């Protein structure tokens, strides 16, 4: 039995449908975000639509906040691409008691709400983190067929050494054969609910023994619960890259012509004005082809962002801007 009942969780729903009749061959794509990712999510959707005009997609955005301006932009986006976008405003009270960190808030648990919400509504959902940009076709995901007992198609994170670390820390030896990043989940909704994954995950996240082991919150938990019931697919669907890698002298950029989704991991996102690098181009192209086209990229608003902004400005040889942001950083830290 799910701990996340629709009537308790969904407060409001806004539907922006400019494709009058939903195609039978439609890929449902879902995002779970807080207010800090609304801008990024909108452009992520635009990037998918821009690169997949021949595919019917319906988008589902689960958030705990949305303004009238945001609703207008999402409506305009659906109209611009003759698409369907649904916004669900959710009650997060049941999630706020779960573990969180500086980098991962309770919003990371929205994927549990998503997987439960679509039970008996859709057979398959593509869950994506909002800090992605699409630069290729997702038709293979639309056509994807799950095998027997398969709960999700996933993409491996990092390398064998990392998998072995997770297997040891999480006392789950089978993870040595593969550990996935939860920012991309092609979910078999029936199997997910048959195995009661969301409820089991929440129970684990309330268990002191498990809390002492996990470092990657729901990602660790999902790897344990879905162990042996996932299929690892091509890394082109979740090509992870931190824009902060650009601060290094030598950068190994995994993004190439085959990449479908760039996943901008780490604290610096392509919607930050200090993220001025070629790897941000896919995001910026989509932004220019969306209702957010005239919106400024975001400036730093806290000490951590001022620090990274300063570092990137020096890397980009914008020295005065670098000095200014370091001064702002020290002011935030000291006062």
Residue ranges and their predicted role:
Residues 125:
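Short aromatic/hydrophobic "clamp" motif used to bind/position activated sugar donors
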Residues 57-65, 153-155:
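Short internal beta-strands
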Residues 132-166:
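Conserved donor-nucleotide/metal-binding helix-loop-beta segment in metal-dependent transferases, i.e.
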Residues 70-72, 76-117:
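Active-site-proximal specificity loops/subdomain of glycosyltransferases
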Residues 1-27, 33, 189-335:
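A glycosyltransferase accessory/donor-loop signature
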Residues 72-75, 120, 135-146, 198:
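Short alpha-helix within the catalytic core of nucleotide-sugar-dependent glycosyltransferases
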Residues 28-31, 48, 58-61:
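Hydrophobic targeting segments
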Residues 35-52:
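Histidine-anchored nucleotide/phosphate-binding helix
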